[in-house]
């Protein structure tokens, strides 16, 4: 195996030397061709220069008739130069293309050789005899592992992707999970402590409110101080509000309901509002009638239809004729006067209506026709 590897290495070296010598030869040949092309161009240019000089001397003796021929010659020369330049450029391009092709072919050949060598070495290693000692097989397997690992390391260094950090006995992901679990446990403990404190405060407030509702708020606060419990400003405020509620209840007889916040409701104002509500919504008694109500009930317009309409509009219940007959003399006189007044008003209304509808062109109404109103 070692001998075959050594022979393969020597064969690769000879091939690389042959390739380099071939490349140098091809480059020298191309340089020579390029220099020869340049020399030819220089000779052509020098010859063209001499020809030009001679032609100028000849043409100086000639007249203006040959000016057109000169311009044609110049055009022909410029075209020939351009053609030569384009030819030289095309040659250079062809040479560069041929070089690139040669390189590609050499690369493909070297790849094919490498593949063949690998396949041969694999086939030989597969078909080896199995009767050799275990120590030799182990040493060979170690050598193979080393050879396989070397190009892999080289390829990893060439690759752009960063390699993962080596394992040094501690896993960072597991450490992060453990830290998170510890934080969660601490947060749970803190939350439980806060809940306990809140429950204790609520109990203290309820005790203080209950003690204040009984009436002896100051005594209860003193008792709490004597017992050693801490009296917070909230407890003191609740006791004060309970004392105010007890005072309002004693004066007005109206207590503030439990669903109201005692710190936000004034008990005296609440009692006044409740009194007003009761007066508004309580039912009227039968015997209580004011004088104005009696006058409106006994009002008479001199016409039964008008009386019925008025009572319906005002919400007055109709009384019996027997009740109406039993009336005092004073009330009877007032009713008579009301009837006369309403009759006069009706007559005046009819007169005004007839004048406004029939005599429109009589001015603003302050004429002799309005004198009849006084006589009525």
Curated annotation (Swiss-Prot):
**Residue numbers bearing the Phosphoserine modification:** 45, 318
Please tell me which positions the record assigns to the cross-link Glycyl lysine isopeptide (Lys-Gly) (interchain with G-Cter in SUMO1). 317
Write out the biased-composition intervals (Basic and acidic residues).
13-52
Q: Give the keywords, sorted.
A: Coiled coil, Isopeptide bond, Phosphoprotein, Ubl conjugation
Region feature (Disordered): 1-171
Coiled coil regions in record = 171-214
Question: Biased composition, Basic residues: where in the chain?
Answer: 53-155
Q: What is this protein called?
A: Arginine/serine-rich coiled-coil protein 2
Q: Which organism is it from?
A: Rattus norvegicus (Rat)
Q: What is the lineage of its organism?
A: Eukaryota, Metazoa, Chordata, Craniata, Vertebrata
């Amino acid at each position: 195996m070692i001998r075959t590897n050594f022979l393969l290495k020597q064969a690769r070296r000879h091939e690389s030397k042959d390739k380099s010598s071939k490349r140098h030869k091809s480059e020298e040949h191309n340089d020579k061709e390029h220099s020869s092309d340049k020399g030819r161009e220089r000779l052509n240019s020098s010859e063209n220069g001499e020809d030009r000089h001679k032609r100028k001397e000849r043409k100086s003796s000639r007249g203006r008739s040959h000016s057109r021929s000169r311009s044609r010659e110049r055009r022909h020369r410029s075209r020939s130069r351009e053609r030569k330049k384009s030819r030289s450029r095309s040659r250079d391009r062809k040479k560069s293309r041929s070089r690139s092709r040669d390189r590609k072919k050499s690369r493909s050949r070297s790849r094919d050789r490498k593949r063949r060598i690998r396949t041969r070495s694999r086939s030989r290693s597969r078909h080896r005899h199995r009767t050799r000692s275990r120590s030799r097989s182990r040493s060979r397997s170690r050598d193979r592992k080393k050879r396989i690992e070397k190009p892999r390391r080289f390829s990893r260094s060439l690759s752009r992707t960063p390699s993962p950090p080596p394992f040094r006995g501690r896993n960072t992901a597991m450490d992060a999970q453990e830290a998170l679990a510890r934080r969660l446990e601490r947060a749970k403990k803190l939350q439980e402590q806060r809940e306990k404190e809140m429950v204790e405060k609520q109990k203290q407030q309820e005790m203080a409110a209950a003690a204040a509702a009984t009436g002896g708020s100051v005594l209860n606060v003193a008792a709490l101080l004597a017992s050693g419990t801490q009296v917070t400003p909230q407890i003191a405020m609740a006791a004060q509000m309970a004392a105010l509620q007890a005072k309002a209840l004693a004066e007005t007889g109206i207590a503030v309901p439990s669903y109201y916040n005692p710190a936000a409701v004034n008990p005296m104002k609440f009692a006044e509002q409740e009194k007003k509500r009761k007066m508004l919504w309580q039912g009227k008694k039968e015997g209580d009638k004011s004088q104005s109500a009696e006058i409106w009930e006994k009002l008479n317009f001199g016409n039964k239809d008008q009386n019925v309409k008025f009572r319906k509009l005002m919400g007055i219940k109709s009384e019996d004729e027997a009740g109406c007959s039993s009336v005092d003399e004073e009330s009877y006189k007032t009713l008579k006067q009301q009837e006369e007044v309403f009759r006069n008003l009706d007559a005046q209304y009819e007169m005004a209506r007839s004048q406004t509808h029939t005599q429109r062109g009589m001015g603003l109404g302050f004429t002799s026709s309005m004198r009849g109103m006084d006589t009525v």
